A protein has these predicted regions:
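Helix-rich C-lobe and terminal helical cap/extension of kinase-like folds
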Residues: 26-33, 46-48, 52-53, 196, ...
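ATP-dependent phospho-/nucleotidyl transfer catalytic cores
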Residues: 91-99, 111-112, 120, 162-287, ...
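Residue immediately N-terminal to the catalytic "proton-acceptor" Asp
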Residues: 140, 284, 289-291
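Juxtamembrane "helix exit" motif at the C-terminal ends of alpha-helical transmembrane segments
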Residues: 288, 415, 513-526
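Residue-level signature of catalytic and energy-coupling elements of molecular machines
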Residues: 73, 137, 154, 211, ...
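Glycine-rich ATP phosphate-binding loop
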Residues: 139, 150-157
Length: 526
């Protein structure tokens, strides 16, 4: 790990101090050493931040630090277990908006990708329509082979963004590893795994070909829904840095007055937002993970078009089943069923009792039944469910935390359309359909067929497996007789790596101490 990564952490700590982020910590809840650290760190604040609220301090600091920190801020908004509920709530207000870069630079990016002048590729190419941390969007016009023209959206990656993300992620990994080493209580939250998830997400988001594929997959999955779709991708105009899709003319879901004036039923739109999200998550295991109002348009006929496939979520069949079983259990007040699902998934250590966990779940679920529709929040229920994880020693599941954050966003959009929206009434048909398909007789027949196929494959592989086992047995016998031998080059490599690692650790200790000093007092309460 380059020494520059340590200095990036120091810089981040300095910016956080200057923007007054340490004021998110309550000194009264800190030990004397922490209270002293707060006083020292606040001496470096800018005078202008003293009147700002916590959300403003956080967003200003992360915007100053750049795209990578905006992304990690959005990610930590899904991890209240790591940063505390208040900080997570403040981070949820963080908007992925940055100043545009010049249109001339965007045109250069297009020309570099396709080897032709931008004016030959597009009959028109607008100034930026929207700009975020990863890319910005322009409106263009292309001439089709038959002479007609077509309006398109041209998404252009920011120049040098990959290099910047890589450098910042190196620093994030250092911070996560040291956090796990020095703060044992954080190990349950798996900060290194969280950064790995962020890294993978960034890799996918920084290749616009994968975003095109994601939009295509989501569109195919939702083909049977007449009220939801994604933009068509212009496949013959594709590169890693450029994404071209059809231009969507419609009303954003945030334009409530416009939607009402156009005669759309806001309650139906709210229901479709949740119906489509749960269908994606529960049935398909692949969902649009950034479903805010600006990413959804309503087109003629009331069809919702979801744009921006840069952030997608994927959960496996077991995790989809886990989600569906939980929601169905709460709908029907089957708390023992929910508890058993947690134990079957291995999320709760076997030393705990299923009955005790079911009792805790009852305390979460019962207040929901009989409550007013506008007091019922599926996202809040899932958050309360996460709150009991510490009591039952449950390790955090980053992919499920990501799903929970997305559900919070989707629910917020639905309630902005219809404040009295009933989440459970909207969820029940989707979950009921899943239960009938996955737990009913047809599902048992399908699983039995899959089992027969797997058994047949195993029988076919037996000769090869037997040969491998015989070879391994001979090699193990040789090791037992002669000992484990390493060639000289390998030994020298081990020695060199160890020496370099020791030097980097020694150089990094003080750098980490400075950076963590700015962050630890905030994390203490999380």
């Amino acid at each position: 790990m380059a020494i520059s990564s340590y200095f990036r952490l120091v810089k981040a700590g300095w910016v956080l101090m200057r923007e007054g982020v340490t004021r998110l910590a309550d000194p009264e809840q800190l030990p004397p050493s922490g209270q002293f650290a707060i006083k020292v760190l606040r001496m470096f604040e800018k005078g202008s931040v003293k009147q700002a609220n916590n959300a403003e301090r956080l967003t200003q600091a992360l915007n100053r630090l750049g795209p990578s920190y905006i992304k990690i801020g959005q990610f930590l908004a899904t991890r209240p277990d790591m940063v505390g509920k208040e900080i997570a709530g403040n981070l949820s207000l963080l908007q992925d908006r940055l100043p545009e870069f010049e249109t001339s630079i965007a045109k250069e990016q297009v020309e570099a990708a396709f080897g032709k002048p931008c004016d030959e590729l597009f009959e028109s190419f607008s100034e930026p329509i929207a700009a975020a941390s990863i890319a910005q969007v322009h409106k263009g016009t292309r001439r089709n082979a038959d002479g007609t023209t077509r309006e398109v959206a041209v998404k252009v990656l920011r120049p040098d963004i990959r290099k910047r993300f890589k450098n910042d992620l190196d620093a994030f990994f250092i911070a996560a590893r040291w956090a796990e080493f020095f703060v044992p209580s954080l190990r349950r939250m798996r900060p290194v795994a969280a950064v790995e998830t962020l890294e993978r997400s960034a890799e996918l988001e920084l290749d616009l070909r994968l975003e095109a594929a994601a939009l295509s997959e989501l569109g195919e999955n939702m083909e049977d829904n007449p009220n939801y779709r994604t933009p068509d991708v212009v496949w013959d105009f594709m590169s890693r840095d450029i994404l071209v899709t059809e231009w969507i003319d419609g009303l954003k879901l945030s334009d409530l007055e416009g939607l009402q004036a156009a005669g759309y039923d806001l309650q139906e739109l709210a229901n479709e937002v949740i119906n489509s999200f749960l269908t994606q998550a529960v049935r398909d295991g692949f969902f649009h993970a950034d479903p805010h109002q600006g990413n959804m348009f309503v087109t003629e006929g009331g069809k919702i078009v979801a744009i921006d496939g840069g952030i997608m979520g994927r959960i496996n069949e077991g995790e989809s089943r886990f989600l569906a079983e939980i929601l169905w259990g709460f709908i029907n007040r089957e708390y023992m069923r929910i508890a058993q699902v947690h134990f079957d998934a291995g999320y709760v250590p076997a030393r705990h009792k299923v009955d005790d966990f079911a009792q805790a779940l009852r305390g979460i679920g019962e207040p929901i039944h009989g409550a007013q529709a506008d007091d019922i929040s599926m996202a809040r229920l899932l958050q309360q469910l996460l709150d009991v994880t510490d009591l039952f020693d449950m390790p955090m599941q980053p992919q499920l935390m990501f799903l929970q954050r997305t559900m919070v966003v989707a629910e917020g959009v639905a309630r902005s359309l219809d404040p009295s929206f009933n989440m459970w009434e909207a969820a029940e048909p989707v979950i009921k359909d899943w239960i009938s398909r996955e737990v009913g007789p047809a599902a048992h027949i399908r699983r039995a067929a899959n089992g027969v196929n797997a058994l047949g494959k195993l029988v076919g592989d037996l000769p090869e497996l037997a040969a491998r086992a015989e070879k391994l047995s001979a090699e193990m016998a040789e090791v037992g007789e002669k000992g484990l031998r390493l060639d000289p080059e390998t030994l020298r490599a081990f020695s060199g790596d160890e020496s370099k690692s020791a030097k980097v650790t020694a150089y990094g200790l003080w750098a980490i101490a400075i950076a963590v000093g700015a962050l630890a007092v905030v994390m203490w309460q999380g």
